[in-house]
A protein has these predicted regions:
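Nucleotide-sugar donor-binding/catalytic module of glycosyltransferases
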Residues: 1-232, 239-241, 245, 260, ...
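C-terminal subregions of glycosyltransferases and related glycan-biosynthesis enzymes
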Residues: 209-305
């Protein structure tokens, strides 16, 4: 497909007439020349005035289009996939319709991406006035990040810039059968194929909000779904053509992420000791499928079991 812009912002929308204004205002405020980017709103069969509100608020000097789905998908995966397929940008950036971004995100993001030929650009993120994760964002700017040293596996949310060519050549799309943590699976898969990764943490760039309104991505995580994601990612890693050193780094970073993820879920759900043993035994069996990639020195002391 023709590349016409530097960046395509992809915004899935579902019944957001009362919440989308900050999102659109932040899009209107972007400092990057408007001729260099586009916005793709993908409406998932909203039943309110979301589309009308977009048309009312969006700066008409911005290149934008609205894709209207006839049947609701129930999650953000299908709308995001439609956005990827319709993109005319060298990079795509995912923005949820109830979140908003810093005015410099596109400008600073494309500058570091073009400078380093980045496949992914990470942005420091804030959730309800608190930074979501800190380790990947210790340094203000990282041109060439390392999956281990820069803790890239610790933030798999998809609010990043991804090179469109990388996504299309490797058929990286959101799995529409996964209705929870679909961004985690997408992020891990993209990380598997990315050769150059950059980080921007000189300011908060992405602002996520939590509220009680219906949300395309808001589903309860279950252990079964979580293990499905990790199993798929491990198998994809094993079958990839990446060199063994990268595979070892990726595998052990994923292992750490899995242990932390399970620990947080078990703590939140107050899992009893008997079930704790069963859950972590299952996780051990899962990663033992390719235990030849295990590297103890890559595991932090407090994460070792």
């Amino acid at each position: 497909m023709e590349i016409k812009y530097d960046i395509s912002i992809i915004v899935p929308v579902y019944n957001r007439e009362n919440l989308i204004k900050p999102c659109i205002n932040s899009i209107n405020a972007q400092t990057l020349d408007k001729s260099r980017w586009e916005v793709i709103f993908v409406d998932d069969a909203s039943t309110d005035r979301s589309i009308e509100v977009i048309e009312e608020l969006i700066d008409k000097n911005i290149n934008y289009k609205i894709i209207k789905r006839e049947v609701p998908s129930g999650n953000a995966s299908a709308p995001r996939n439609e956005g990827i397929k319709a993109s005319l940008g060298k990079y795509v950036f995912f923005l949820d319709s109830d979140d908003y971004i810093d005015s410099k995100l596109l400008e600073n993001g494309i500058n570091i991406a073009l400078k380093n030929d980045s496949d992914i650009v990470y942005f420091k993120m804030e959730l309800n006035a608190r930074t979501v994760t800190k380790r990947p964002f210790k340094h203000p700017i990282v041109d060439k990040a390392d999956i281990e040293k820069n803790h890239l596996m610790r933030t798999l949310r998809i609010f990043k810039m991804f090179k469109t060519k990388m996504l299309r050549e490797n058929n990286i799309l959101f799995d529409v059968t996964v209705n929870v943590c679909e961004d985690m699976l997408f992020g891990a898969t993209a990380l598997l194929y990315a050769k150059n990764i950059s980080i921007l943490a000189d300011r908060d760039y992405y602002f996520a909000s939590l509220h009680d309104e219906p949300h395309l991505s808001k589903k309860k995580m279950t252990l079964e779904k979580l293990f499905h994601i990790y199993f798929y990612t491990i198998q994809s890693l094993y079958c990839s053509n990446r060199d063994i050193n990268f595979k070892i780094k990726f595998y052990n970073a994923l292992l750490i992420r899995c242990v932390e993820h399970l620990r947080d879920i078990c703590k939140k759900d107050k899992i009893n000791n008997e079930n704790l043993i069963r859950i972590f035994s299952f996780a051990s069996d899962l990663f033992n499928l390719h235990k030849e990639m295990f590297e103890l020195k890559q595991i932090y002391e407090n994460e070792r079991l």
